[in-house]
């Protein structure tokens, strides 16, 4: 995009710095918990191991989740500083599987985007998709299941156990 806009490397870096600061400010405003997410995580915690695999920057991820209290449900977090190639490449999920010392056949991914679903599939995972407002009209033909509500993830996990 920078090349198309004719931005120099310095202009690109200044733009990125401003963008990241504005994004961090937006994240600090909170209100990002998906309805039903905490109840679902609480129900799953005693039954399965969970980790987060995200393409988010580490600093942005921390801003989001320091205020939600949801990190207590997860063993580990894989963020964009932990792998070379981002989603839709499988690298983030392969790193997650290595950390858990589990095979893809023993896990599922829960995603909200085509890029995430593609990464999970390329890593050999079954992917359950719970689209968000921005992705609800996307094509998720590679999904193991597409759900309308995050609370329905519990039923899928129950079926697979």
Regions found by a protein language model. Give the residues of each.
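Asp-based, Mg2+/Mn2+-dependent phosphohydrolase catalytic module
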Residues: 38, 42, 48, 58, ...
């Amino acid at each position: 995009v920078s090349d198309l806009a004719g931005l120099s490397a310095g202009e690109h870096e200044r733009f990125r710095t401003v963008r990241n600061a504005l994004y961090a400010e937006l994240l600090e405003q909170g209100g990002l918990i998906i309805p039903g997410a905490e109840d679902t995580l609480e129900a799953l915690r005693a039954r399965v191991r969970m980790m987060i695999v995200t393409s988010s920057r580490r600093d942005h991820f921390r801003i989001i989740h320091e205020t939600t209290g949801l990190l207590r449900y997860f063993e580990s977090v894989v963020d964009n500083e932990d792998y070379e190639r981002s989603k839709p490449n499988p690298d983030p999920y392969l790193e997650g599987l290595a950390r858990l010392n589990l095979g893809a056949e023993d896990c599922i991914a829960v995603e909200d985007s085509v890029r995430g679903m593609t990464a999970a599939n390329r890593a050999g995972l079954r992917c359950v998709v719970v689209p968000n407002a921005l992705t609800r009209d996307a094509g998720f033909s590679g999904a193991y299941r597409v759900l309308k509500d995050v609370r329905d993830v519990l039923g899928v996990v129950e079926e697979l156990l």
